[in-house]
Swiss-Prot record:
Keywords: Cell membrane, Kinase, Membrane, Phosphotransferase system, Sugar transport, Transferase, Transmembrane, Transmembrane helix, Transport. SUPFAM superfamilies: Duplicated hybrid motif (SSF51261), Glucose permease domain IIB (SSF55604). The EIIC domain forms the PTS system translocation channel and contains the specific substrate-binding site. The EIIB domain is phosphorylated by phospho-EIIA on a cysteinyl or histidyl residue, depending on the transported sugar. Then, it transfers the phosphoryl group to the sugar substrate concomitantly with the sugar uptake processed by the EIIC domain. One of its GO terms (cellular component) is plasma membrane. Pfam families: PTS_EIIA_1, PTS_EIIB, PTS_EIIC. GO terms for biological process: D-glucose transmembrane transport; phosphoenolpyruvate-dependent sugar phosphotransferase system. This is PTS system glucose-specific EIICBA component. It catalyses: N(pros)-phospho-L-histidyl-[protein] + D-glucose(out) = D-glucose 6-phosphate(in) + L-histidyl-[protein].
Amino acid sequence: MWKKFFGQLQRIGKALMLPVAILPAAGLLLALGNAFQGDALQSLMPFIKAEGFQNVAKMMEGAGGIIFDNLAIIFALGVAIGLASGDGVAAIAAFVGFIVLNKTMGMFLGVTPEKAADAATGFANVLGIPTLQTGVFGGIIIGALAAWCYNKFYNISLPSYLGFFAGKRFVPIMMATCSFILAFPMAIIWPSIQGGLNAFSEGLLASNTGLAVFLFGFIKRLLIPFGLHHIFHAPFWFEFGSYKNAAGQIIHGDQRIFIEQIRDNVPLTAGKFMQGEFPVMMFGLPAAALAIYQTAKKENKKVVAGLMLSGALTSFLTGITEPLEFSFLFVAPLLFFIHAVLDGLSFLILYLLDLHLGYTFSGGFIDFFLLGILPNKTQWWLVIPVGLVYAAIYYIIFRFLIVKFNFKTPGREDKEVKSSNVAASELPFKVLDAMGGKANIKHLDACITRLRVEVNDKAKVDVQELKDLGASGVLEVGNNMQAIFGPKSDQIKHDMQQIMDGKITSPEETTVTEEGDKETAEIAAAGGGVVYAPIKGEVVDISEVPDKVFSEKMMGDGIAIKPETGEVVAPFDGVVKMVFPTKHAIGLESKDGIELLIHFGLETVKLEGKGFDILVKENDNIVLGQPLMKVDLDYIKEHADSTITPIVVTNLNGRTMEVLQHGEVKQGDKVILVK
């Protein structure tokens, strides 16, 4: 029961990231628009006092503000899409459900426009509907309900005379019905829930605010490995606390109150549950990255320098910390625990200094500048000395403990690797056994790089055995296991499914072959070759790819390209080794024996081929510059996590790889040398 609930929480936490990702754009517009209307910036740049400039500034502030004013519907749409694998029908259902819920609650409670205008009543005008104020939580509830309706009814069959309403068209209909029913209990119980939340938050802060902010920072950081931190901080940011803004509306949540106080140009009281991130993300973690680099083995420092520099800059500028945190989380849990304690203490220290800083996305310099320095409404400069002290503490602690306990942080790993003597034909049987057997498999899937398995009991999974069988990495998220077997992952998954269905009973019947391994051995003794850019765009370091399978080089080394166009051409003369069924990735082999994976975008496997047109098939011979794939780039931008495209050499095996060009490239430019 708990494991299933935990898995659902992880999915909800991930779904919350879609609407949260909108907030930085809203914050940028609001912060700049507000700053341009402020005396501080106008005294430095008198020309911005011009009427035209001020009108633009007001429009910018209004454009950003309207997003914060409508967070409830944004969260409803975002959560629905996130929990329904990106299908737009779920968003339509969420919108239908949102307006039905609010209209029904408003009519049931007899809410008039006059009542909604009085914030003290707990009512509000939501999209012009006088109704009960349920805030972001109401949006999340509707989004989750819409996703449930979609997943339950998207493929429903109806009698032929009702066939038009079958399938996905049935989802909004059911959502309207469910929302109408939900409105009555919501109208009855929500006022008590909101009152309880307010009483809890006020009591928490009144009893011991310092302890509250410390525990918030400490617990939030500890939840990051489980992906539950987004759920934990949501009540603090969007529901706890209250503030009556200049328009007479009651605003709930630390983040929303902070933004409203910026807009109202009043003294700040919010930010207690956000500001502690700045010293850690801008100073502490970059210093930890320096310690990890300096304690790496000499022969590995060049590689580690790139990883740590990228992670440190990401943390400093944007406040995205996972690339750094996951570099030491699993190999040195003690460091992560100390990191969590220091994070909580940072919240406490800034509270004791009576600072009030906030952000729209995370505690990086961009938010610090836009919502701290520009508004200039609190003593933001105190973050700098606190941060410098934090940098020293992080560096000293990390360096000392890494050396003292010989933690295998990046660059300090043992080089000895246990090789697998298992025949390729036996691999699906061995992997199934390592996963705990057929009875332990709840759901089996794969993409071109990894085997994705949801298990019933994670304790029955032998992670070390999976690595010994050839997995370059094993990721564990709740009861979901991801074993990185590279391009043969789909073959392994296919054969495992056939074994579980009783269709394969012996190794001789499997489809996984040793051909690739034999060729790899031959190639390792041969020369190298050149890889030419298959896509026009910007070449970036592979460590910048926001997917650990690629950024940590579990599949191999290479580059990534941020594409400007959707045309993919052959990067060398060779042969097509694999075209994934969902068309988002293609495996090639050059005449020099270089095996290359081109993986267009991230999580594009979920698009099921939409937006992709493959122009070749497996075993086709190809020549340099030959078109391989046409991609609808606009569709991918709208529906995928990212368009960044990893281009990975999957069979280096002792050879070296050199990146020949960074920055802007056109098709046919030399980008990789294997030697």
